[in-house]
Amino acid sequence: MREVISIHIGQAGVQIGNACWELYCLEHGIQPDGQMPSDKSLGGSDDSFSTFFSETGSGRHVPRAVMVDLEPTVIDEIRTGTYRSLFHPEQLITGKEDAANNYARGHYTIGKEIIDLTLDRIRRLADNCTGLQGFLVFHSFGGGTGSGFTSLLMERLSVDYGKKAKLEFSIYPAPQVSTAVVEPYNSILTTHTTLEHSDCSFMVDNEAIYDICRRNLDIERPSYTNLNRLIGQIVSSITASLRFDGALNVDLTEFQTNLVPYPRIHFPLATFSPVISAEKAYHEQLSVAEITNMCFEPHNQMVKCDPRHGKYMAVCLLFRGDVVPKDVNAAIATIKTKRSIQFVDWCPTGFKVGINYQPPTVVPGGDLAKVPRAVCMLSNTTAIAEAWARLDHKFDLMYAKRAFVHWYVGEGMEEGEFSEAREDLAALEKDYEEVGVDSMEDNGEEGDEY
């Protein structure tokens, strides 16, 4: 089997973890106590779920996951919540004091105390796998644990499991709303440290998801639960190919092969459609062409940036439900003709398609409508550089005054790390810029389009 281990770090990672595992359980017919009612196990020969769940002797299904936080409150909610008997107590790891939004605490002082325990638990999960294909790491950029501890763990995973794929789902600080003043510092430090250890990083920004909840689901004041369930749908779409059999199956390494043209350019933009409330879905049936089209609308994206200003390097369309290749091909053809979608000139084709016949599942009583088909688009576009530029600018404003820096230095970090990280991100922006520039071999013919 090709197992995948999920690692959920810090408050954001753990709460997204809750949403994801809730959804996986519904999709696979696993009850909150880990039992799978017998009719399923008799009728379906489909055991693809074992990439994400391991089965115990007593017939319980345990997620291949670890949840880590440097303070206990968030994970305590799992220990007392609906899914308390789904996880093995050893999979829920908590420290005693939090990282206080400080990368240095998560990476050096507090994180150090818990890293070996965490790696030990991950090792146990890995030993339980027959053919581990890699790790999914969920965290935020802005928090202390999410930034500092994640980068520490990624470094150690690279040492212990060199060639295994590591994919991240990262919550990027929203442009307007902020949960911590020092988010730009944490984000840039963690990106710099993790850049060489991560194979592919799907970024999600809270503000973009707030807007989607407001606009598409008419939720006046979205809560984290609303946001996380939507993120859960995206994660589920991306991992569906690992958990179900489909016509065109995609595994972890296949994502990288198709989405990452250069090792550093590994931040695809995720878009999911249709995000639609039950009342609306009752009145409209969305075709493959329509949902595919919706993916190219900037307001359906999970990060605020405008692909119309950038160029696409690769696009991966993951369909689920009632979808046939003929419709997909037609939809893509239409988009290619009528859209102002620009591909970089060195990557002319650029569409990869995956189809899974398992229809999308929704949490009962949630905000999302049950739809017969959905699509998740992962696109590697140069426009995401806007997000880095935004963050770098905020970093510069604070760092010019050395604001808050003493908190980091006081936890054993050197000030040089700030400038080193900032230079690395400047280089990353430059990389994106260069990828988008047309190749030199234009003999003047293509130059007339602009």
Curated annotation (Swiss-Prot):
Q: How is it modified after translation?
A: Undergoes a tyrosination/detyrosination cycle, the cyclic removal and re-addition of a C-terminal tyrosine residue by the enzymes tubulin tyrosine carboxypeptidase (TTCP) and tubulin tyrosine ligase (TTL), respectively. Acetylation of alpha chains at Lys-40 stabilizes microtubules and affects affinity and processivity of microtubule motors. This modification has a role in multiple cellular functions, ranging from cell motility, cell cycle progression or cell differentiation to intracellular trafficking and signaling.
* Keyword Aminoacyl-tRNA synthetase found: no
For this entry, list what GO says about its biological process: detection of mechanical stimulus involved in sensory perception of touch; mechanosensory behavior; microtubule cytoskeleton organization; microtubule-based process; mitotic cell cycle; positive regulation of detection of mechanical stimulus involved in sensory perception of touch; positive regulation of mechanosensory behavior; response to mechanical stimulus
UniProt key word Magnesium = yes
Task: Give the matching PROSITE patterns.
Answer: TUBULIN
Give the record's GO CC terms.
axon; cytoplasm; microtubule; neuronal cell body
Extract one GO molecular function annotation from the record: metal ion binding
Official protein name in the record? Tubulin alpha-3 chain
